């Protein structure tokens, strides 16, 4: 079963997601409860966010898996490979970080991102537009497929995602491409999920 929890920044969605999965796991008697963390630390603000999330889940029995990209690889890190998926639940926190990591990979030995190196080889705006469209499609399909694989290996999967579509601001092209990809993925996840909840000012509102 998949539950998608969405909301704006600071809405309380993370706290609600942790409370929700702890309740469900206790109620259904899941023996293993995983926290799949996708955030990478690049600055002090990022470290503060990670520290806050660690404090939130301290003492709640989570087994933490650090998986900033290639989310299907988290499956091989589930501790009891021989146990049935019926004994496992997982919280994926969060989709917006995962998508950013997939779309903007780390720099290579030359100091250039892989995507930047590919763009350097293009010789015109039409080629660039085709490349960006293909990248949005490729990353979106990859993430949705890998989340589906993960969901097949746990009894309960809770996914936290961000609502990044309502500020009405035009950003640079790379950011707009990211927002488009997030829209595709969030719609795909909502279609896959049995439950969709939006958290508004700390209040969960059932959408599906």
Could you tell me what each predicted segment is?
Residues 2-4, 32, 89-91, 156-158:
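Residue-level preference for the first positions of well-ordered beta-strands
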Residues 2-80:
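Conserved P-loop
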Residues 10, 40, 96, 164-165, ...:
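Short, glycine/serine-rich, charged loops/turns that create anion-binding
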Residues 17, 53, 91, 162, ...:
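Residue-level signal for inorganic ion chemistry
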Residues 36, 64-66, 91-94, 159-160, ...:
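Short, conserved beta-strand edge motifs with alternating hydrophobic and charged residues
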Residues 55-106, 112-119, 123-126, 130, ...:
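Portal/gating segments that form or line small-molecule/metal binding sites
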């Amino acid at each position: 079963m998949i539950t998608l929890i969405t909301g704006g920044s600071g809405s309380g969605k993370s706290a609600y997601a942790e409370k929700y999965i702890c309740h469900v796991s206790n109620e259904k008697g899941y023996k293993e409860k995983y926290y799949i963390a996708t955030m990478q630390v690049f600055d002090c603000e990022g470290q503060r966010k990670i520290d806050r999330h660690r404090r939130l889940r301290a003492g709640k029995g989570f087994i933490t898996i650090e998986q900033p990209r290639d989310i299907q690889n988290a499956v091989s890190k589930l501790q009891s490979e021989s146990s049935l998926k019926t004994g496992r639940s997982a919280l994926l926190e969060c989709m917006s970080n995962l998508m950013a990591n997939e779309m903007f990979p780390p720099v290579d030995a030359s100091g250039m991102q892989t995507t930047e190196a590919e763009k350097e080889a293009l010789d015109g705006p039409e080629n660039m537009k085709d490349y960006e469209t293909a990248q949005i499609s490729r990353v979106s399909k990859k993430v949705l497929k890998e989340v589906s694989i993960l969901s097949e290996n746990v009894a309960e999967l809770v996914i936290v995602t961000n609502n990044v579509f309502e500020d009405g601001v035009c950003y640079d092209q790379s950011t707009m491409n990211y927002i488009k990809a997030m829209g595709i993925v969030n719609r795909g996840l909502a279609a896959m999920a049995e439950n969709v909840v939006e958290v508004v000012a700390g209040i969960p509102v059932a959408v599906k």
